[in-house]
């Protein structure tokens, strides 16, 4: 598994299972990585386009930050106009993926009871180890949001609703 991060977060990335850590401030992952089966993109479209190039033939790029694809339009039962808009939003990246012999899909993250139950079991058993950066009391919600907006959180930012 490979990831990009700043040099300051290299040890954290390795502790979470990364075999290869690339300092995005100094290196271009596109020139270092190749022949991956799957890419999970949480960055911008420019990074997503680079990610397509590190996949092996028939590889898959999954983006949680967009652009939404036609399947997403169907999944949310969008009206015909919105389906057309969604299709247009991802037309460029889908075309580039096809030219490279890989596929692209958009994954819309949402809370679903059954999935959350499964995730809870994985956390409780230690399979998933969430990284919590900071915990804010409820009355400091604005501070928590401001911290998230800095883009410098190293894990989850939690807002504690009530005292235990």
What are these regions (language model features)?
Residues 1-164:
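Terminal helix/beta-alpha structural elements that buttress the NAD(P)+-binding lobe
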């Amino acid at each position: 598994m490979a990831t990009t991060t700043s040099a300051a977060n290299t040890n954290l990335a390795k502790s979470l299972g990364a075999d290869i850590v690339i300092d995005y401030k100094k290196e271009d992952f596109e020139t270092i990585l190749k022949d991956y089966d799957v890419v999970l993109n949480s960055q911008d479209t420019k990074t997503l386009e680079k990610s397509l190039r590190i996949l092996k033939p028939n590889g898959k790029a999954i983006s949680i930050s967009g652009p939404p694809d036609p399947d997403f339009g169907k999944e949310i039962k969008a009206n015909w106009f919105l389906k057309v808009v969604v299709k247009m939003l991802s037309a460029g990246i889908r075309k580039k993926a096809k030219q490279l012999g890989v596929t692209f899909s958009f994954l819309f993250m949402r809370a679903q009871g059954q999935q959350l139950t499964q995730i809870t079991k994985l956390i409780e058993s230690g399979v998933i180890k969430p990284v919590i950066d900071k915990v804010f009391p409820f009355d400091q919600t604005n501070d928590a949001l401001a911290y998230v907006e800095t883009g410098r959180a190293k894990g989850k930012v939690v807002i504690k609703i009530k005292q235990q």
